Amino acid sequence: MVETLLSGIILGLIPITICGLFFTAYLQYMRSGNSFY
């Protein structure tokens, strides 16, 4: 029971962390891109 709960939490956290990393990288890219103009 605990293992399934842990695997569910890990499977739920992995996409959220990946989306967060892409979001922060996108924001930094937009900021650096806007500063060039």
Swiss-Prot record:
GO terms for cellular component: chloroplast thylakoid membrane; cytochrome b6f complex. Its main location: plastid. It is a single-pass membrane protein. The 4 large subunits of the cytochrome b6-f complex are cytochrome b6, subunit IV (17 kDa polypeptide, PetD), cytochrome f and the Rieske protein, while the 4 small subunits are PetG, PetL, PetM and PetN. The complex functions as a dimer. This is Cytochrome b6-f complex subunit 5. GO terms for molecular function: electron transporter, transferring electrons within cytochrome b6/f complex of photosystem II activity. Keywords: Chloroplast, Electron transport, Membrane, Photosynthesis, Plastid, Thylakoid, Transmembrane, Transmembrane helix, Transport. The keyword Protease does not apply. The gene is petG. InterPro entries: Cyt_6/f_cplx_su5, Cyt_6/f_cplx_su5_sf. It is found in: Plastid, Chloroplast thylakoid membrane. It holds the Pfam family PetG. GO terms for biological process: cytochrome complex assembly; photosynthesis.
